[in-house]
Amino acid sequence: MCGQCGIILGKKRRTREELEALGNMFTELLKYNERRGRDATGIFVADQSGIGKILKAPVSAICLTESIEYQNAIQEIGNRAVALSGHT
């Protein structure tokens, strides 16, 4: 089995606090989906140009969300981001 989650942000200017809250919400969704798949986890952060950042690893969602790479990816979410997608 596997789990999928996502947040569609659309084009809107958000405050740093709003972006942080969205990042936290996405992290919780990803961890919640861990029960559907524990062997690997990946995320994709899409921006307005269609280019995005992919992060994946052969670890559980909880392990990935605790990594420096994940924390950096979530902190980099800015006003150009239009969607967050996760897979466990």
Kindly label every feature range from the protein language model.
Residues 1-88:
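N-terminal glutamine amidotransferase
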